[in-house]
Amino acid sequence: YDTIFDSESHKVIDDFAHHPTAIKETIKIAKEENEDVALIVELGSNSMRKGIHDDALIEIFKENHSYVVSASEEQQKKFADYAEPLTENAIKNLLQKSNSKKTILMCGNKNFEGFQTLILDSLI
């Protein structure tokens, strides 16, 4: 759990959580500080990419404003009602100013396909 950016409008947290149990715990900690959490999950490990944890992830996505990185086409279809693929347009929407501070929680064990850098560059 590493805060990599913090301002009046946004906080960005990078966490190595890449298993549903760890992701749930990290969300819980983040929400203790701020209820307005956007979750970005990178499906980087073999078990995540193979879909072994898809059902558990759907349960997590149902309860959070969620985005996925590195999902297969099949997973994107499965997650469609609960999480959207992270794109440049999604990032623009995510970073829009609002009346309250937003926490962006990035859970994964890879590099988020460069999206983390794009988010940070957009905030700085």
Model features per residue range: what roles?
Residues 2-124:
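ATP-dependent carboxylate-amine ligase
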